[in-house]
């Protein structure tokens, strides 16, 4: 069968759209339906139309048919019943992967070549100040290390691995498989040496032939000033042991900066919220402001409003890129008193009158109000 017969059955061209194919199918299906068409051969043509539409209406099967004909579409390259399942989780997995598997495209890698070990991750908590100024920390963790008994060979001391008797050191085996396209050859990992190309007759008693053993490991980490949560530091060669004499993997230290009770931070800028009284805001004052670099004095000008922000230059965190120091932003929050004594209330009333404010004078406190205030102060 040529690669256009299915299209011919539906009466469409090879570049027909899915809508065109669907319309043609409905037309041809109705034309040859056994309940409508009683001519000899109509039933077979109806089945042929169904077969063609089943393939061409599926984009994956259609692609297989266009390239390989009916054998490709019906043979199950898409992982269907009776086909080669598992190439791409059930879908039409791509011919590059399929032919790589059959013709040994992935088997050219030398199984005995040195291979780097796996990378590891380690999370480190930093205080707010440690993140600002930098710190050196020692981290401890377990990792797969080269076996100290066999030095990574996997063989008992005094012995050595030998060439695999099945794959003869290649680490792979060649298998012929019958497919709808004919006989195909593929390479698979050797089931004796598991790809290493070597057999261990007498395994090491410490690592049981793996060449690796779990070991406790410590390493010092220099954390630069100005780091933030989520940033990573890579320590080369501090991961897990390699294979066939390959290098160790790397350790990635992931940083987590703990919150501060006083400050907030975004990049090199530190934020601080300053509570002041309304008299300080109205009359002005000089107050001490905490910073990560020590306390500094800040002049609050008379008439300062809530939300006013002052900048303390150079009192922030270091800039990781470009150098220099960030600033600290101080935002004012004017605190309104919730309780007033008689003298304070009278003073405020006098202030309101002097300001020309029209307001209802609050009712003077009675005996029970004074008792309630006294109990709250206890």
UniProtKB/Swiss-Prot annotation:
Gene3D superfamilies: DnaJ domain, Heat shock protein DnaJ, cysteine-rich domain, Urease metallochaperone UreE, N-terminal domain
Name by which UniProt lists this protein: Chaperone protein DnaJ
Gene Ontology CC terms: cytoplasm
Lineage, top ranks: Bacteria, Bacillati, Bacillota, Bacilli, Lactobacillales
Entry-linked SMART domains: DnaJ (SM00271)
Gene, per the UniProt record: dnaJ
Comment, domains: The J domain is necessary and sufficient to stimulate DnaK ATPase activity. Zinc center 1 plays an important role in the autonomous, DnaK-independent chaperone activity of DnaJ. Zinc center 2 is essential for interaction with DnaK and for DnaJ activity.
Species annotation: Streptococcus pyogenes
Residues spanning the signal sequence: none
Known role: Participates actively in the response to hyperosmotic and heat shock by preventing the aggregation of stress-denatured proteins and by disaggregating proteins, also in an autonomous, DnaK-independent fashion. Unfolded proteins bind initially to DnaJ; upon interaction with the DnaJ-bound protein, DnaK hydrolyzes its bound ATP, resulting in the formation of a stable complex. GrpE releases ADP from DnaK; ATP binding to DnaK triggers the release of the substrate protein, thus completing the reaction cycle.
Residues involved in Zn(2+) 1 binding: 147, 150, 204, 207
PANTHER family documented for this protein: CHAPERONE PROTEIN DNAJ (PTHR43096:SF48), DNAJ HOMOLOG 1, MITOCHONDRIAL-RELATED (PTHR43096)
GO biological process, one term: protein refolding
Domain J: 5-69
Keywords: Chaperone, Cytoplasm, DNA replication, Metal-binding, Repeat, Stress response, Zinc, Zinc-finger
CDD domains assigned to the protein according to its UniProt record, in alphabetical order: DnaJ (cd06257), DnaJ_C (cd10747), DnaJ_zf (cd10719)
């Amino acid at each position: 069968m040529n690669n256009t017969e299915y299209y011919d059955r539906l009466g469409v061209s090879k570049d027909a759209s899915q809508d065109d194919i669907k319309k043609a199918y409905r037309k041809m299906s109705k034309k040859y339906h056994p309940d409508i068409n009683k001519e000899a051969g109509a039933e077979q043509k109806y089945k042929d139309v169904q077969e063609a539409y089943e393939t061409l209406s599926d984009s994956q099967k259609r692609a297989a048919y266009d390239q390989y004909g009916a054998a490709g579409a019906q043979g199950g390259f898409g992982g269907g019943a009776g086909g080669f399942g598992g190439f791409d989780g059930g879908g039409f997995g791509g011919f590059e992967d399929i032919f790589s598997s059959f013709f040994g495209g992935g088997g050219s890698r030398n199984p005995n070549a040195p291979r780097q070990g796996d990378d590891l991750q380690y999370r480190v908590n930093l205080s707010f100040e440690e993140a600002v100024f930098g710190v050196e920390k020692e981290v401890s963790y377990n990792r797969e290390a080269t076996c100290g008994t066999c030095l990574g060979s996997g063989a008992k001391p005094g012995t050595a691995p030998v060439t695999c008797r099945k794959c003869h050191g290649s680490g792979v085996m060649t298998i012929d498989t019958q497919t709808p396209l004919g006989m195909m050859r593929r390479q698979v990992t050797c089931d004796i040496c598991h790809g290493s190309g070597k057999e261990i007759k007498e395994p090491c008693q410490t690592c049981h032939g793996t060449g690796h053993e779990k070991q406790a490991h410590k390493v010092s980490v220099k954390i630069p000033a100005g780091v933030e949560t989520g940033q990573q530091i890579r320590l080369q060669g501090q991961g897990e042991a390699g294979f066939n004499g390959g290098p160790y993997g790397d350790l990635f230290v992931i940083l987590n900066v703990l919150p501060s009770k006083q400050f907030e931070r975004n990049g090199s800028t530190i934020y601080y919220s300053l509570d002041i009284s309304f008299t300080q805001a109205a009359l002005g004052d000089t107050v001490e402001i905490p910073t990560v670099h020590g306390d500094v004095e800040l002049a609050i000008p008379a008439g300062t409003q809530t939300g006013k922000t002052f900048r303390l230059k150079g009192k922030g965190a270091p800039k990781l890129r470009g150098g220099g120091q960030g600033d600290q932003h101080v935002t004012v929050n004017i605190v309104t008193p919730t309780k007033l004594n008689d003298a304070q209330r009278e003073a405020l009333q006098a202030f309101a009158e002097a300001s020309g404010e029209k307001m209802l004078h609050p009712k003077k406190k009675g005996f029970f109000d004074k008792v309630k205030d006294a109990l709250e102060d206890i």
